[in-house]
């Protein structure tokens, strides 16, 4: 199995996408809370 390229994809994915999703969900939660 050629899974040696997996970390080079997962590390940036987890390092960039996860914080972005967290920031986006937090931003939407704050915006929704301010509207209501």
From Swiss-Prot:
Keywords: Chloroplast, Membrane, Photosynthesis, Photosystem I, Plastid, Thylakoid, Transmembrane, Transmembrane helix. The keyword Thylakoid applies. The chain crosses the membrane at residues 9-29. GO terms for cellular component: chloroplast thylakoid membrane; photosystem I. It is a single-pass membrane protein. Pfam families: PSI_8. It is found in: Plastid, Chloroplast thylakoid membrane. One of its GO terms (biological process) is photosynthesis. InterPro entries: PSI_PsaI, PSI_PsaI_sf. The keyword Acyltransferase does not apply. Its main location: plastid. May help in the organization of the PsaL subunit. Belongs to the PsaI family. This is Photosystem I reaction center subunit VIII.
């Amino acid at each position: 199995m050629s899974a040696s390229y997996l970390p080079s994809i997962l590390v940036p994915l987890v390092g960039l996408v996860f914080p972005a999703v967290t920031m986006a969900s937090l931003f939407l939660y704050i915006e929704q809370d301010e509207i209501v």
